[in-house]
Amino acid sequence: MKNLLVFIFVFSLCMFDHVSGAGIRIGNELKFQKLLWMRCYSKDDVLGPKIIPIGGHFVTYFSVNIWRTTRFMCTLKQGPNYRHYQNFTAFKLFGMEDHGDVWDWRARENEIYLKKKEGGKFIKNPVNMHKVYDWIN
């Protein structure tokens, strides 16, 4: 019985490790007082639509599933009548050891930037701030 309790305790710790938190941050760094429209979704959740003011940001945290298939898609819109837009994968995992951490997106005048925030040894493919997408007219 004692061995069973030890096994259950260790197994529980391993399971908590595999469902650790992750998140998305979307910041509005547009010029000329432009608002940023955003909507994100996964298989189970819909976030938004929300309007992010200049200099503002939207942050959400969530748990990744045990199968490591958690993925969020987002749409961002800006400009007159929100005619400039981009649809993209805002969060995904790259394997069993990847915990996801926070994917930090920044909407700027001509492009959208990403920085995957480093959260220790478990982050796979950490990146510095770099351009990922152009706006679609």
Swiss-Prot record:
Top-level taxon: Eukaryota
Residues forming coiled coils: none
Protein name: S-protein homolog 16
GO cellular component, one term: extracellular region
Compartment(s) of residence: Secreted
Upper taxonomic lineage: Eukaryota, Viridiplantae, Streptophyta, Embryophyta, Tracheophyta
InterPro entries referenced in this protein's UniProt entry, alphabetically: Self-incomp_S1 (IPR010264)
Entry annotated with the keyword Cell inner membrane: no
Residues making up the signal peptide according to the UniProt record: 1-21
Pfam name, any one: Self-incomp_S1
Record bears the keyword Glycoprotein: yes
Key words of the record: Glycoprotein, Secreted, Self-incompatibility, Signal
UniProt-annotated glycosylation sites, renumbered to this chain: 87
Protein's organism: Arabidopsis thaliana
Family: Belongs to the plant self-incompatibility (S1) protein family.
GO BP field: rejection of self pollen
